[in-house]
Amino acid sequence: MSSRSLVAAAVVALSGCAITQDVTPSGLDQRAQELCLVRNSEVVQDGFHDVYERVLEKKGFKVRWLPDKSPITSCPLVGTYEVIYRWDLAIYLARADLRIYADGKEAGRAVYDSLSGGANMNKFIRTEPKLTELIDQLFPKLKAFLRMKPLAEIAA
């Protein structure tokens, strides 16, 4: 087999093991807003909702949970999410699709997808660091809440 054929075969094989992440930043720049999250009852992974809420609170949001299937016009700022966990030697976050709506219109979206990750070992990630990364990219103008507080307040 020629070297070109080997390279082509390697590219085809590796392209099937892709992990993708695509973020459209929200552009929101106000701190400490209330963010209403529409609970997705299909997400049953232990602790996911607590982790997602904690990550958003660290970003400065006051999180209020809305019932499953609430309209995106229920609050001025609404978040929805779809999350898939898979098992392959261990349970891991395989896909997360986070959407933010401002006044009923999509204002930002973050999608992490390792469903085509195949044998790629980078698919084995922990939920909190990945959600933190996605939220930081989704709200790039908002600094983490702890970093915004004066040192005297943090020490108290």
Model-identified regions with their sequence ranges:
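C-terminal/domain-edge helix-coil "capping" segments
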Residues: 18-28, 57, 110, 114-156
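Surface-exposed short loop/turn segments
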Residues: 21, 55-125, 129
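A sequence-composition feature that detects small, non-aromatic residues
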Residues: 8-13, 18, 32, 90, ...
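Generic hydrophobic secondary-structure signal
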Residues: 6-14, 56, 98-100, 131-138
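A structural "domain/chain start" motif
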Residues: 4-10, 16-65, 147-156
